[in-house]
Amino acid sequence: MIFFTLEHVLTHISLSIILIVITIFLMNLLVYEIEGLSYSSEKGMVASFLCITGLLVIRWIYSGHLPLSDLYESLMFLSWSFSIFYMIPYFRNKKSNLNVLTAPGTIFTQGFATSGVLREIHQSTILVPALQSQWLMMHVSMMVLSYAALLCGSLLSVALLVILFRKSSFTFSKYKGYYLPIGPLYFSEIQYVNEKKNIFLSFRNYHRYQLIQQLDCWSSRVISLGFLFLTIGILSGAVWANETWGSYWNWDPKETWAFITWTIFAIYLHTRTNKSLQSSNSAIVASIGFFIIWICYFGVNLLGIGLHSYGSFAIT
């Protein structure tokens, strides 16, 4: 009982902290930066990460297995994964601008996990025989980490497309590490200077060009990491399936959509490394992949069919 109470308390504390972090970030965008608030939001993300880590450890202790056996537990692990992708650059550079993606992702997944829709599967249960394997940790953790990385990378690509294809854009200025719009700018006003076969953007929109390049670079790195996790997850799942069901691949809904997801992001990496294609081409592919991931992740749980329907819930 005490473990369940601690888990409940930590869940609501982390949700409250994330809400405050998002509010602070929006305030910083509206009024540039309020002294001390940016520092508080960074510490808030760290505190939220520790809370989510604590509740996962508590659930692991009283359930006796890694909390990855149903939709509720995988959503909480996905929230933790979003926080991880914030923490890595933060501890490396003592600053991370990824909270614009990771904070909403954390609160969305954690909020859905703790909603009434999943109330019936909040309680930890004994694993079914098929899940009582050492492959559970490797396969499911790699898949959920890949979902978090690919979702973050895809959202960066969506942001890149918005900046590229808007007819009316804004001039961007760098202020304390953030790229902020300071005024309207139409593409017809952008001047290019061609000298010695090198193309330079006008100084007026130099930061916009920098932002596009950084978004392209960040999305490529994050998606590449997610693709690696996805590949490891699929391969470990195939080995696990062979041990459990006697076949490496069965083409059930989850496996089919995992293969589609892998194919989409393989195409992304191909277009990204092809120098004859523009960055917008790969960004479009990644944007499509964003929706494919959610179909792959929630599809089987909503339908409740196939070999991967453990922990699914019924819509009433």
From Swiss-Prot:
Compartmental location: Plastid, Chloroplast thylakoid membrane
UniProt record similarity statement: Belongs to the CcmF/CycK/Ccl1/NrfE/CcsA family.
Subunit composition and interactions: May interact with Ccs1.
Transmembrane segments: 12-32, 44-64, 71-91, 98-118, 145-165, 222-242, 256-270, 283-303
Disulfide linkage: none
Gene Ontology MF, one: heme binding
Keywords: Chloroplast, Cytochrome c-type biogenesis, Membrane, Plastid, Thylakoid, Transmembrane, Transmembrane helix
Organism: Ranunculus macranthus (Large buttercup)
PANTHER family listed in its UniProt record: CYTOCHROME B_B6 PROTEIN-RELATED (PTHR30071:SF1), HEME EXPORTER PROTEIN C (PTHR30071)
Gene Ontology CC terms, in alphabetical order: chloroplast thylakoid membrane; plasma membrane
Main location: plastid
Topological type in the membrane: Multi-pass membrane protein
Pfam families documented for this protein: Cytochrom_C_asm (PF01578)
UniProt name for this protein: Cytochrome c biogenesis protein CcsA
Record's keyword annotation contains Ribosomal protein: no
GO biological-process terms attached to the record: cytochrome complex assembly
Function: Required during biogenesis of c-type cytochromes (cytochrome c6 and cytochrome f) at the step of heme attachment.
